[in-house]
């Protein structure tokens, strides 16, 4: 499990940039939150996954989006930004010594939950610095692929 430092915000629309700040900090890149909010084009409805990919790359990460199921994700050994409940971004930090999934949520801070509960809320899209191992079947490589994958999940983009 990675010890991602939680960042909490009072504005719900800032969840994407806040998660990106946590991920960047994990890779020793500090960027001011207000800068990320501006660069992600955060508006009244927040930002998009495409914004997270673009801004992460702007700050040196090899950001990629993948459609992977919860079982694949919880077995990864590094943090990722995940699309949560089809409306929110949180950071997946890994599993603890008891097998609980550890998340850093911009609205709640760090918390743990069972893998079963995680599966109920995880929206099957995750954002990584580089490729997760093993590589999931679906690499959402282009903006069109990303929009198509989210469309299949019932998310308007």
What are these regions (language model features)?
Residues 12, 155-157:
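Polybasic/polar functional segments that serve as interface/processing modules
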Residues 1-150:
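Conserved active-site-adjacent core of cysteine acyl-enzyme catalytic domains
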């Amino acid at each position: 499990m990675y010890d991602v430092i939680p960042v909490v915000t009072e504005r719900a629309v800032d969840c994407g940039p806040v998660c990106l700040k946590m991920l960047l900090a994990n890779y020793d890149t500090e960027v001011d939150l207000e800068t990320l909010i501006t660069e992600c084009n955060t508006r009244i409805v927040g930002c998009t996954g495409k914004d997270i990919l673009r801004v992460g790359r702007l700050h040196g990460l090899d950001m990629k989006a993948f459609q992977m199921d919860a079982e694949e994700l919880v077995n990864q050994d590094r943090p990722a930004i995940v699309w949560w409940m089809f409306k929110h971004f949180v950071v997946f930090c890994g599993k603890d010594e008891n097998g609980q999934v550890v998340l850093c949520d911009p609205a709640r801070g760090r918390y743990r939950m069972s893998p079963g509960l995680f599966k109920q809320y995880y929206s099957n899209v995750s954002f990584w610095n580089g490729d997760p191992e093993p590589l999931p079947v679906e690499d959402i490589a282009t903006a069109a692929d990303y929009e198509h994958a989210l469309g299949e999940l019932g998310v308007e983009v």
